[in-house]
Each structure stands twice: as C-alpha cells, then as structure tokens.
Amino acid sequence: MALEADVKKAIIDEYATHPGDTGSPEVQIALLTKRITGLTEHLKEHKHDHHTRRGLLLLVGQRRRLLGYLSNVDIERYRALIARLGIRR
C-alpha cells in the first residue's frame, strides 16, 4: 500500500536532517514504519491476504536492515529515532 503524497511529504519534513533530505536512514525508516503500520491494520481485517503479508515481511526486513545500519553508524541517532517512532527494539 503506497502512501499518499501529502502524508509522505509530512513524514519527510518531520524526520529530515536537512532541507531536501529524502534519503537519510531516519526518513527511510519513518516512511517504512508508516507503511508497516498501514499494512498491519489491513491484515487485522483481511487475515488470509498472504500476498500482503509477504510484502509486510519484506518491509519489516528492510526496516530492520536500515536500523542495524543506523545503530552501527551513530548509536545516538538510532536511539533517538526508535524513541520518536515508538519502535520497541
């Protein structure tokens, strides 16, 4: 499920480290978290939608890799981000 343009822009503006930032790990992880939340809500209602479940697992894996990268590069940015997003990890 793709994010609407205005929602995506709001997330990018909130988590950007500098103006025009769309590729930093913080922004990517925040966007993935929003998509994961949406797919999780979808799967609560449509339990047998296995194609969506696979897509969700791929997104979770991608977010996990980005979180691992961020924790290796800058642990303080990592801790601040998971606190802001409310990701228990």
Curated annotation (Swiss-Prot):
Secretion signal, residue range per the UniProt entry: none
Keyword annotations: Ribonucleoprotein, Ribosomal protein, RNA-binding, rRNA-binding
Keyword field contains Ribonucleoprotein: yes
GO molecular function: rRNA binding; structural constituent of ribosome
Superkingdom to which the source organism belongs: Bacteria
GO biological process, one term: translation
Keyword rRNA-binding: yes
Pfam families: Ribosomal_S15
One GO CC term on file: cytosolic small ribosomal subunit
Subunit structure: Part of the 30S ribosomal subunit. Forms a bridge to the 50S subunit in the 70S ribosome, contacting the 23S rRNA.
Family stated for the protein in its record: Belongs to the universal ribosomal protein uS15 family.
Role according to the record: One of the primary rRNA binding proteins, it binds directly to 16S rRNA where it helps nucleate assembly of the platform of the 30S subunit by binding and bridging several RNA helices of the 16S rRNA. Forms an intersubunit bridge (bridge B4) with the 23S rRNA of the 50S subunit in the ribosome.
PANTHER family xref list: RIBOSOMAL PROTEIN S15, BACTERIAL AND ORGANELLAR, SMALL RIBOSOMAL SUBUNIT PROTEIN US15M
Name of this chain's protein: Small ribosomal subunit protein uS15
Natural source organism: Clavibacter michiganensis subsp. michiganensis (strain NCPPB 382)
